[in-house]
Amino acid sequence: MAEVVFRDLAEHQGLGAHIVSTSAGTSEWHVGERADIRTIEALDRRGYDGSRHRAKPFTAASFTENDLVVALDRTHERILRQWAPDEDQEGKVTLLLAFDRAAENLDVPDPYYADTATFDSVLAMIETASRGLFRQLEPALRSSLGQRAQRRTTPSQYSSPQN
């Protein structure tokens, strides 16, 4: 859910081409499979397309391939921190609900053994926290993109004077 929500948010803010949102599990259960149909249905009810998602495992390369590693609960956060090859990589690991100021708990519940309403509730949590995460990342990202655009235009701004 979080991958789909965050990607959609980035696209709607005009930054989809500059942000890569992926999802990976800490176990190899369901590798290659689609998301649970109840997840896809919950996403669909809120206007998201979760049909392209396929489960894949988090690997050692995942740390170097990503600037941020977002865990949905403290158990996964602990596992990811243990897997980090060094302190810099460990520092990339954070909890999604840490970006929701109103969250009473830092763990996103696993709705797998629950009813449809729980899937919808979990999705609402993910949406709120994803907006908080995006608000935190957006200024630095836009600034970085602006600096790149400025560097591309700088040479023409400083052309030599004509005599």
Question: Model-derived features: where do they sit?
Answer:
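Short polar/charged helix/loop
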Residues: 1-163
